[in-house]
């Protein structure tokens, strides 16, 4: 991942942890979701076609970008979640 994307996503680590490991998200502003969606598309070359008013679409986006983020930043995870992520 590009450094500026990692830096932006760092502020949303908690949201990505809850999405990836607990399958829920809290309310995230639409402008933030749009930027996270842009980052996902930039990093993967794929579009999730996210509807920002659809809770399952938002969860899918946060899980997808979270998995990308944690692959490169596994050290930011608590130890018990590191094992879960490595074994997933």
What are these regions (language model features)?
Residues 19-76:
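Acidic, low-complexity, intrinsically disordered interaction modules
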Residues 2-3, 80-88:
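Short acidic DE-rich linear segments
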Residues 1-26:
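Short terminal alpha-helical segments
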Residues 1, 11, 29, 37, ...:
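Acidic metal-coordinating catalytic centers involved in nucleic-acid phosphodiester chemistry
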């Amino acid at each position: 991942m590009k450094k500026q994307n990692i830096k932006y996503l760092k502020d949303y680590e908690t949201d990505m942890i809850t999405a990836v490991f607990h399958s829920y998200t809290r309310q995230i502003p639409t402008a933030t979701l749009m930027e996270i969606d842009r980052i996902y598309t930039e990093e993967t070359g794929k579009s999730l076609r996210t509807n920002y008013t659809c809770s399952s679409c938002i969860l899918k986006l946060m899980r997808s970008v979270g998995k990308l983020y944690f692959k490169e930043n596994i050290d930011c995870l608590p130890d018990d979640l590191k094992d879960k992520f490595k074994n997933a």
